[in-house]
């Protein structure tokens, strides 16, 4: 039977790369998408579930049968400063609760460098780092097997990745740096094979 891993935020810049990297190692990604999201051509053949993540029943159905979930959702910059609260805290919490209900026991969460920091310029966007930390805490307390990835300075660069060095540290060890989104995606796939 094929391995299936759900990816929420699969149409985003990091999310679609996570799905592509899953395909590269023979895992079938189940793309969890907003109704209006576009999917890159490389993922058109993948299973797609369009839903509002606030709909608990739809979320449970979307996750049922998956062996794991990679959460790559994130609030987009907007004049609506409640986005980070709705997406990065409550939306993450809702996905975790759904995993508990349908027995998806492994979760990888893409968060952000400096999550939880109050005095940081990114917090001008709806206290995003504070809300991301609340989402992380929900996962930490869930009883599920989990990994939180906190990348910073995400770049779109796709060349020279084989010459990159990824520095893995514990929480709050790095203040700044940059990493290509493709390498974050690979870290997510690697994390699926590593129990917390």
Write out the residue ranges for each language-model feature.
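Residues forming the Rossmann-fold NAD(P)(H) cofactor-binding site
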Residues: 16, 89, 186
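Residues at the starts of beta-strands that form the adenosine-phosphate
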Residues: 4, 28-30, 105-106, 145
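NAD(P)H-binding glycine-rich loop region in Rossmannoid oxidoreductase-like domains
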Residues: 5, 31, 37-101, 116
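Substrate-positioning beta->alpha
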Residues: 92, 175-190
């Amino acid at each position: 039977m094929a391995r299936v891993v759900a990816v929420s935020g699969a149409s985003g810049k990091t999310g679609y790369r996570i799905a592509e990297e899953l395909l590269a190692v023979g895992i079938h990604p189940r793309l969890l998408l907003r109704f209006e999201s576009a999917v890159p051509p490389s993922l058109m053949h993948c299973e797609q579930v369009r839903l509002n993540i606030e709909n608990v029943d739809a979320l449970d159905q979307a996750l049922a049968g998956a062996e794991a979930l990679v959460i790559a959702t994130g609030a987009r910059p907007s004049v609506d400063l409640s986005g980070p609260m709705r997406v990065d805290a409550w939306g993450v919490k809702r996905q975790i609760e759904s995993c508990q209900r349908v027995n998806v026991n492994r979760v990888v969460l893409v968060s952000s460098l400096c999550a939880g920091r109050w005095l940081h310029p990114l917090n001008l966007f709806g206290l995003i780092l504070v809300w991301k930390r609340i989402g992380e805490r929900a996962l930490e307390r869930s009883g599920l097997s989990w990994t939180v990835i906190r990348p910073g300075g995400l770049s779109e660069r796709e060349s020279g990745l084989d010459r990159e060095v990824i520095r893995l540290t514990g929480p709050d060890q790095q203040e700044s740096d940059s990493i290509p989104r493709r390498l974050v995606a690979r870290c997510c796939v690697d994390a699926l094979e590593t129990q917390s």
